[in-house]
Amino acid sequence: MDLLWILPSLWLLLLGGPACLKTQEHPSCPGPRELEASKVVLLPSCPGAPGSPGEKGAPGPQGPPGPPGKMGPKGEPGDPVNLLRCQEGPRNCRELLSQGATLSGWYHLCLPEGRALPVFCDMDTEGGGWLVFQRRQDGSVDFFRSWSSYRAGFGNQESEFWLGNENLHQLTLQGNWELRVELEDFNGNRTFAHYATFRLLGEVDHYQLALGKFSEGTAGDSLSLHSGRPFTTYDADHDSSNSNCAVIVHGAWWYASCYRSNLNGRYAVSEAAAHKYGIDWASGRGVGHPYRRVRMMLR
């Protein structure tokens, strides 16, 4: 009987039994024990090697936002020298051109009041140094706007814009400025009109247009009629008509009763889609025959 118990135990011993490894949890494997009564050798097993890590679980839901932090300390006052520097900076695009800025693009000019103003300078046309204050080209910007909008200026630097009546007033307070109007029809034909001087009075005078003599241009003169006229928008009627010209023709301009030019009028995407009143220059294509592209610029 004792032999029957011993043989299986020896068989396990010959097979080597479970492998024993030293780990931190089990620094050594327990040795074999022998039971005196039965002479049976017991081979205790050791803990196996740790398995490989399982896959990372999915992230849990986002927790609620924390409470707002405390308000930071008050910042230091700005440097008043910046105002002085702007007062000493360039006042027009021609001055920038003389300083070596030969590429057309957006620059900063200093207004007489000391404020920096971003403007587009055309450094290529007719000797360069032109400040573009109005541009129409694709109808992406609505020009049927309020008095306050025309006062401040609006639009997109990459497409269409109006620089702003107050900015034009500040710019033309000093020096002599000439005006160039450029027009392009839907067939790509380009014309222009040139005026000796241009100035815009202040808001107290409703941004009245003070225009010099028409000097030259293939487009003819369609702006002299508007010289001496205040600016009119749909919510500020200063024209000489019994009605509001801005409302009638869907624009904003130095209307009389009503116009020979209307370069802030409604945009037409094609000749076939022309409106009764649009971007017109009467001495050019006539009223009701709008232009596809327009630029107004000063130097």
Curated annotation (Swiss-Prot):
SUPFAM superfamilies: Fibrinogen C-terminal domain-like. Ca(2+) binds at D237, D239, S241, S243. This is Ficolin-3. It comes from Homo sapiens. It comes from the Eukaryota. Its main location: secreted. One of its GO terms (biological process) is host-mediated suppression of symbiont invasion. Keywords: Calcium, Collagen, Complement activation lectin pathway, Disulfide bond, Glycoprotein, Hydroxylation, Immunity, Innate immunity, Lectin, Metal-binding, Repeat, Secreted, Signal. Residues 1-23 form the signal peptide. The N-terminus is blocked. Gene3D superfamilies: Gamma Fibrinogen, chain A, domain 1, Gamma-fibrinogen Carboxyl Terminal Fragment, domain 2. Homotrimer. May form an octadecamer consisting of an elementary trimer unit. Does not interact with fibronectin, elastin or zymosan. Interacts with MASP1 and MASP2.
